[in-house]
Structures are given as structure tokens and as C-alpha cells.
Amino acid sequence: MAKLLSASQVLTIKRRTIQLEGAWGDCLGEIDSTGVVLVWGQSGNGKSSAVMSLAKELTKHGKVLYVSLEEGYALSFQNTLRRYSMQECKARFQVVTGEDMEAISARLSKRRSADFVVIDSFQYSQLNYKRYLEFKKKHSNKLIIFVSHADGKQPAGRAAVSVKYDADQKIWVEGYKAISNGRYIGNTGEYIIWEQGAKEYWGRKTKNNNEE
């Protein structure tokens, strides 16, 4: 049977947290260093750029493993690496492709493995919700970021929707903005991926809403 704690006792528990800086600090503020983050959105809205930018911010706090299941080492992925000068991160940012989730899990179980892992994408991981929970439990000492396709405004597929409700942090990407929908919200709750694109997209959306 689990031990009961008072509110005062819970508040004395020290959590290892990360204070994000700059634009990501404005979006998310201070976050737990472990748990699950789900980032989802429609194609062409800046999701890959947002995730890469967040990964670079996390390299200030530890090692990041980017599991490129969907794009592999394609030119589009290379261009995203160049856009955010990921080579500056050196050994703190590493990429792997061509491995299934069992191999990824074994890699994360090794000593001195990455502190943060990006799984791009959840759909290509072929995890169902049960296997997701097992993966999350096995690697509870990591911050796991899942990137997901979208079906409308929801993650694509029943398992991904379940992950959304379970995740500690949820980030919806639309119109070149990453919007915090989870437990951690900074000063603005938003990260602007591409300022001009966001201004044009949200300007049109506001205009269309006003005309309806």
C-alpha cells in the first residue's frame, strides 16, 4: 500500500526542473526534467521547426537524442538542422534512424544515454497505448517528446489521442505558432516559429472570423 503524504510533505519533495530561456521560456516557463511532451499539428504549420528549436534549447540542460523515424536523413531534415545550426550542439545532440522502438528502448537504457529523446513521429513508432505506457514507465528518468500528425485539431489516431490526455505537456502547432495546452505555461504560452508567417496566418484567421 502506498504511503499517504500531507500537502506539506508533498511540497517538500524536490523536483529536478528546467527553467527554459528566451522564447521557449515565454511559452512553457519552468518544466519537469522528466515526463512526456506531445507536439502535434497539421503538416506545413512549422511543427518540425518548433520541435528542433525546443531540442536545441534542451541541449543547454543535457543530451538530446532525436529519433528520426519519419524523415530519416532526408534533405528536409538536413535543412531543419541547418536552420537551427544544430551542429553547434556537438555531442549534446545526436540523431538516429532505422531503429525500431525496442532498439531505441535498449539504447536509452544504457549508462550515459540521452536525458531527452524526441520520437518523430508517434505514428511511425507504431506504438499502441499499452506499449506507450510501458515505454514511458521504463524510461521515467527521461523527458520524452513525441511528435504527432493531426486529424483536425486532435492528434491522429486513437493511441495518439490517449497520449495527449496522459502527457504532462501538450503543444499544439498552428499557423507558425507553438501553443502550450498543458500543465506548464510561461508568460505568453506561445512560441513564434516564423514571425511573418504567423502574422499573416493569424491576421487572415481573425479577419475571416470577424466576417462570419
Each language-model region and where it sits:
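Pre-Walker A adenine-sensing motif
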Residues: 15-32
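Short, surface-exposed basic-aromatic patches at helix termini and helix-loop junctions that form
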Residues: 57, 82-86, 110-111, 134-141, ...
